[in-house]
Amino acid sequence: MRIRFTKMQGAGNDFVVLDETRGTLGLTAAQYRFLADRHFGVGADQILTVRPPSKGAAEGVDFQYVIHNADGGEVEQCGNGARCFMRFVREHHLTDKDTVRVETLAGIIEPRMGADGRVTVDMGPPIFEPARVPFDTAGLDPQPTGSWHTWHLALGTHADSAIVSVAVLSMGNPHAVQVVDNVDTAPVARQGPLIEHHPRFAQRVNAGFMQVVDRSHIKLRVFERGAGETLACGTGACAAVVAGIRLGLLERRVDVQTHGGVLTIGWEGEGHPVLMTGPATTVFEGDIEVPELP
């Protein structure tokens, strides 16, 4: 099967974008993995699919936004991808609106195209209840910090174990954020997989490593669930800033420096949505022959 694709990136987080507004391609998990493969496919952190609203979608929804990780699994949300989604539907003349309502597994989001070409996404309010992350707190005691708390997680075997302190929340997908002294030397490669697959996270988790530079500036690395460390993670940036605000470390508007670029995150507090602003760029377009894979 030969398909048309668009390669895009937002702050270095890269995507293959597929247009299914005129009909579904019916790709399997193995075929999504093929497209994401950097040696045999196109190469991407995630595969993003544009579809019409689903049956029973809320009134006023313009599109459905479907996300598959590089491992082929479907996930709830991707912030950097949402910005690329907005640029895609504008550049491909699927809408002429500056703001669209988009249906995801995590709920409705509203990307907005700015006059400067950057895209702002209303990511909705963060979720703090452990059961909704989901995060199993049985036998754990919260560690009060600022106006919130963190949790101690044991990682690794007895011979090579560590205790890390993480703030746990959901931005439509689960995040565990820890504050580190130096993000460049943080043990992302070692601890990231252990946190991602920690048994207390039933759906696995994105592991964030945040260095607070000052109250309006952080540096961030994220080991993404199903993708590994990426150059940037939009929901990870949102989760880190929200955690930092609740822990008393950050102001309401923060620039997040990732390896791929800068994202600006704003949050006014409990019950308010998180707003994420950043770049979205088309890299190239093409066609690829996708083999029949189960």
From Swiss-Prot:
Enzyme class: isomerase
SUPFAM superfamilies registered for this protein in UniProt: Diaminopimelate epimerase-like
PROSITE patterns for this protein: DAP_EPIMERASE
Species name: Variovorax paradoxus (strain S110)
Compartments reported by the entry: Cytoplasm
Subunit structure as annotated in this protein's UniProt entry: Homodimer.
Entry's EC annotation: 5.1.1.7
Pfam family, one: DAP_epimerase
Residues binding substrate, per UniProt: N13, Q46, N69, G79, N80, N173, N206, E224, R225, G234, T235
Active site: C78 (proton donor), C233 (proton acceptor)
Top-level lineage group: Bacteria
Alphabetical keyword list: Amino-acid biosynthesis, Cytoplasm, Isomerase, Lysine biosynthesis
A GO cellular component entry from the record: cytosol
Stored PANTHER family: DIAMINOPIMELATE EPIMERASE, DIAMINOPIMELATE EPIMERASE, CHLOROPLASTIC
Lineage of the species this protein comes from: Bacteria, Pseudomonadati, Pseudomonadota, Betaproteobacteria, Burkholderiales
Reaction catalysis annotation: (2S,6S)-2,6-diaminopimelate = meso-2,6-diaminopimelate
Protein name (Swiss-Prot/TrEMBL): Diaminopimelate epimerase
